[in-house]
Amino acid sequence: MEELQGYLEIDGSRQQCFLYPLFFQEYIYALAHDHGLNGSILYKPMEIFGYDNKFSSLIGKRLITRMHQQNHLILSVKDSKQNLFVVPNKYFDSQMMSEVFAVIVEIPFSLRLVSSLEEKKIAKSHIRSIQSIHSIFLFFEDKFSHLNHVSDILIPHPIHLEILVQTLRCWIQDAPSLHLLRFFLYESRNSNSLIIPKKSISFFSKRNQRFFLFLYNSHIYGCESIFVFLRKQSSHLRSTSSRTLLERTHLYGKIEHFLVVLRNDFQRTLWLFKDPFMHYVRYQGKAIMASKGTHFLMKKWKYHLVNLWQCHFYLWSQPDSIHINQLYNHSFYFLGYLSRVQLNPSVVRSQMLENLFIIDTAINKFETIVPMIPLIRSLAKAKFCNVSGHPISKPARADSSDSDIIDRFGRICRNLFHYHSGSLKKQSLYRIKYILRLSCARTLARKHKSKVRAFLKRLGSGFFQEFLTEEEQVLSLIFPRTYSTSHRSHSERIWYLDIIRINDLANHE
């Protein structure tokens, strides 16, 4: 990593204009291999990326040798049968090159992230808590109880692969690297259709997920840049009227001149976005935008977003991609939770001398619950139960031991409880535990060709201990046996700051 940082610091312009020579450096392939095993450069676990263990430094050396032997490294994507390297295993070379390409283009952004964290004096140990999915719900609890309207947004996909290339041209001005990017995109298009997929997650190729995650995030960054632009313009205009920041006289003078020229068009449009209570949250291809403003303001946001996406970013937005609802009467689904703002009435008694006052108040409270029907559908899709929620047995491998099978089912149960620990009503989660526990018992009974009841009797209470959740284990140690720990675990809401990806079974998008 020190060699790479030294290379990038030779000249600031080289960080973006000369990425292609890095493909011929052996330490880049070693870096890609290490990140594949330990996590990406942005501190994310590699189970997200579906990493291939065959990707070794020895194979990287052989690939570099073959690249040096080639005379034509500029690709032609017109012929789908043409490949970069005339070798027997061309698919694996293409896969490895796309992984290396993703690592190379991540590096300048990662160095920028590290420098930004150092400027803001944020420790690297706090990165995981900042990236935690549960931290989003803490933000919801703090902000959404005071808002009025919420918009569910499905971010559109590019209508053509060349749009992704044009997006990266702002950062990568190296022509050979852009040709490589086109090659990888069109190769993936020939094997997997990436244009207007049915679901956002299907946008990523299962084979080169690191590469497509980077491209997708770059694409989303372009769509979200309009929020930053409008926020900055709105802030500048307010400062222009107040004349408080004298060191920006020239900047505000230009903006004032700009307003004189386009006062009738631009200023009339911009006032619609002067909403200090607008909040925006995104995960993958879905976003939530909430505001304290009126329904008319939210409709204006929808109108301008759709037009900007289609006219400026060339993104086709479906008519039903943005839904506007009143926050008090609507439950929105996000990150595996069903969230809503509930009015909780309360009675306050106050006595002054001989007079007794009773005041009825209503407090807005942000609530999160587990959607049972989508979760049971996910379990049915994974063959743990049928669509009605009745547990079924899964086919077990002959070489799998009983302890491995029990550990696998118990780990799935604990992970689900861990992810949904922020739910106010956990009673529904115990039905999920029942499904997984009985599915495990039926799987073991099927393996040993015996009845479920007899097999459970033989296993004893140790079998049920494997399905104890983390909260239940802690509460059982803190409180005595006579205390009802189940009541506490049902009512307590816990947010964990170590969860940086959505649970696979909870992702029903």
Swiss-Prot record:
Subcellular location: Plastid, Chloroplast
Signal peptide: none
One example GO MF annotation: RNA binding
The keyword Membrane appears for this protein: no
Keywords tagged on the record: Chloroplast, mRNA processing, Plastid, RNA-binding, tRNA processing
One GO cellular component term: chloroplast
Keyword RNA-binding recorded: yes
GO biological process annotation, one example: tRNA processing
Similarity comment: family membership: Belongs to the intron maturase 2 family. MatK subfamily.
PANTHER family: MATURASE K (PTHR34811:SF1)
Role: Usually encoded in the trnK tRNA gene intron. Probably assists in splicing its own and other chloroplast group II introns.
Name of the protein in its database record: Maturase K
Taxonomic source organism: Drimys granadensis
